Swiss-Prot record:
This is Photosystem II protein D1. Chlorophyll a ChlzD1 binds at residue 118. [CaMn4O5] cluster binds at residues 170, 189, 332-333, 342, 344. The D1/D2 heterodimer binds P680, chlorophylls that are the primary electron donor of PSII, and subsequent electron acceptors. It shares a non-heme iron and each subunit binds pheophytin, quinone, additional chlorophylls, carotenoids and lipids. D1 provides most of the ligands for the Mn4-Ca-O5 cluster of the oxygen-evolving complex (OEC). There is also a Cl(-1) ion associated with D1 and D2, which is required for oxygen evolution. The PSII complex binds additional chlorophylls, carotenoids and specific lipids. The record marks 190 as: Stabilizes free radical intermediate. It comes from Selaginella uncinata (Blue spike-moss).
Length: 354
C-alpha cells in the first residue's frame, strides 16, 4: 500500500512538472525545447561576457603569436572579440578537460568553441520552442520556419564553414571588427561578391527592408481615423479590436496608381506571406552559399576573360576585384605565410641543379 502511494505521488510530481513545462499560461513559455535552450544560451552568454572582458590572447594561427581580443588586454568595444580556437586544435572537440590546464585551454581559444557550440544548440532549441508554442496554441508553424533563416546563417559561418576549411580558427570571430575581418578574408579567399547565392541574399535583405518600409508607410498613411484632429491617430486603436485598422482598398489604389495596378496586393494574407518569404528565402540562399564556399566552390571568376581580336586582355571590373582580393589575402595571416596561395602556386622554387 505504501509503495502504491509513493508511486502515485512520484507520478503526480512528474505530471505536475510536465504540465508546468508545457503550460501556455506561464508568463514565458518554457516547453521541452526550452529545457535545453535555457542552460545552453545562459552558458554561451555568460562565457561570452567573461571572455570578452578578461580572456588572455589566443594563438589563433597556431604559430605561437597570440592575438588579443578582450577588454582587459587593450581592446575596446569595437576592436574586442572572442578569438576563434587555434589552428593547432583544428576541428577537434576541445572541452576544458581535454587541455592540460585552464591556461592552455585559454591560450588555444577554448572559449570560442564552447560559446559557439552552446549558442548554436540554443538557437536551434529556440526555433523548436517557437514551433512547440505555435503547436500548443493551434497556430500555423511559419514563425519557426522564418526563424530558420538566421539559424541557418549562424550555423553556416560558425560550424559549416570551419568544417569545410578544416579548423575552427577559420570561423567568424565574435566581435564587431572580427566580423568585418571575416567578411574581408572571405571575399579574398572565395570571391563571395561574385557568387549568385550571395547576390540573392543581398536582394533578400535589402528588398525585405524596402518592402517593410513600403508596407509600414502605406498602412500608416491609410489608417481609419477613430479620433479627433487633436489626438494621435494611433490612440484610436484598441488591442484585439475586430474592425480593420487601416483601409487596404485605399492603400491598394494608391500603390496601384503609383506603380501599376498589378504591382499592388489586393489580398492581405498573400501580402504578408510575401513580406515574410522574400527575406527568408534570400537568407536561406546566403547560408547555402556560405556552406558551398566552405568547401571551396567559390564565386564566379572572370579574370582576364575579355580579350580583343589580337588576344590582348581588356581589363574589366572582375580583374580589379581579383587584384583587390590578392591584396586582402596578402594582409591576412601575414605571419603565417609569406604569399597567398594564388601567388605561391605561380612561383616556382629555383632549381639548385639548374
Amino acid at each position: 500500500m505504501t509503495a502504491t502511494l509513493e508511486r502515485r505521488e512520484n507520478a503526480s510530481l512528474w505530471g505536475n512538472f510536465c504540465d508546468w513545462i508545457t503550460s501556455t499560461e506561464n508568463r514565458l513559455y518554457i516547453g521541452w525545447f526550452g529545457v535545453l535552450m535555457i542552460p545552453t544560451l545562459l552558458t554561451a552568454t555568460s562565457v561570452f561576457i567573461t571572455a570578452f572582458i578578461a580572456a588572455p590572447p589566443v594563438d589563433i594561427d597556431g604559430i605561437r603569436e597570440p592575438v588579443s581580443g578582450s577588454l582587459l588586454y587593450g581592446n575596446n568595444i569595437i576592436s574586442g572579440a572572442i578569438i576563434p580556437t587555434s589552428a593547432a586544435i583544428g576541428l577537434h572537440f576541445y572541452p576544458i578537460w581535454e587541455a592540460a590546464s585552464i591556461d592552455e585551454w585559454l591560450y588555444n581559444g577554448g572559449p570560442y568553441e564552447l560559446i559557439v557550440l552552446h549558442f548554436l544548440l540554443g538557437v536551434a532549441c529556440y526555433m523548436g520552442r517557437e514551433w512547440e508554442l505555435s503547436f500548443r496554441l493551434g497556430m500555423r508553424p511559419w514563425i519557426a520556419v522564418a526563424y530558420s533563416a538566421p539559424v541557418a546563417a549562424a550555423t553556416a559561418v560558425f560550424l559549416i564553414y570551419p568544417i569545410g576549411q578544416g579548423s575552427f580558427s577559420d570561423g567568424m570571430p565574435l566581435g564587431i571588427s572580427g566580423t568585418f575581418n571575416f567578411m574581408i578574408v572571405f571575399q579574398a579567399e572565395h570571391n563571395i561578391l561574385m557568387h549568385p547565392f550571395h547576390m540573392l541574399g543581398v536582394a533578400g535583405v535589402f528588398g525585405g527592408s524596402l518592402f517593410s518600409a513600403m508596407h509600414g508607410s502605406l498602412v500608416t498613411s491609410s489608417l481609419i481615423r477613430e479620433t479627433t484632429e487633436n489626438e494621435s491617430a494611433n490612440a484610436g486603436y484598441r488591442f484585439g479590436q475586430e474592425e480593420e485598422t487601416y483601409n487596404i482598398v485605399a492603400a491598394h489604389g494608391y500603390f496601384g496608381r503609383l506603380i501599376f495596378q498589378y504591382a499592388s496586393f489586393n489580398n492581405s494574407r498573400s501580402l504578408h506571406f510575401f513580406l515574410a518569404a522574400w527575406p527568408v528565402v534570400g537568407i536561406w540562399f546566403t547560408a547555402l552559399g556560405i556552406s558551398t564556399m566552405a568547401f571551396n566552390l567559390n564565386g564566379f571568376n572572370f579574370n582576364q576573360s575579355v580579350v580583343d581580336s589580337q588576344g590582348r586582355v581588356i581589363n574589366t571590373w572582375a580583374d580589379i576585384i581579383n587584384r583587390a582580393n590578392l591584396g586582402m589575402e596578402v594582409m591576412h595571416e601575414r605571419n603565417a605565410h609569406n604569399f597567398p596561395l594564388d601567388l605561391a602556386a605561380s612561383i616556382e622554387a629555383p632549381s639548385l641543379n639548374g
